[in-house]
Amino acid sequence: MLVLTRKVGESIRISDDIVVKVIDIGKNRIRIGIDAPSTVSVLRNEVYEEIHQENILSSRGSVTDLAKAATLWARKSKKEE
């Protein structure tokens, strides 16, 4: 991990098109601004983790639902024969 020290108003550039700027330094918080193209997803880590967990849960449910649908489809096909 690269650790840098910056003052209010100073920036860090990530590649050619992403800039992270220190906006304010408070007692227990640091406010940063991120300038990035709209094609780049910028999320707080806790939001990213929540989305990741929801995706895992929904993919598990989809497999189960797909298996149930396949079973129903197979039963229906046998009845039609």
From Swiss-Prot:
Belongs to the CsrA/RsmA family. Homodimer; the beta-strands of each monomer intercalate to form a hydrophobic core, while the alpha-helices form wings that extend away from the core. This is Translational regulator CsrA. Keywords: Bacterial flagellum biogenesis, Cytoplasm, Repressor, RNA-binding, Translation regulation. One of its GO terms (biological process) is bacterial-type flagellum organization. It is found in: Cytoplasm. GO terms for cellular component: cytosol. A translational regulator that binds mRNA to regulate translation initiation and/or mRNA stability. Usually binds in the 5'-UTR at or near the Shine-Dalgarno sequence preventing ribosome-binding, thus repressing translation. Its main target seems to be the major flagellin gene, while its function is anatagonized by FliW. Pfam families: CsrA.
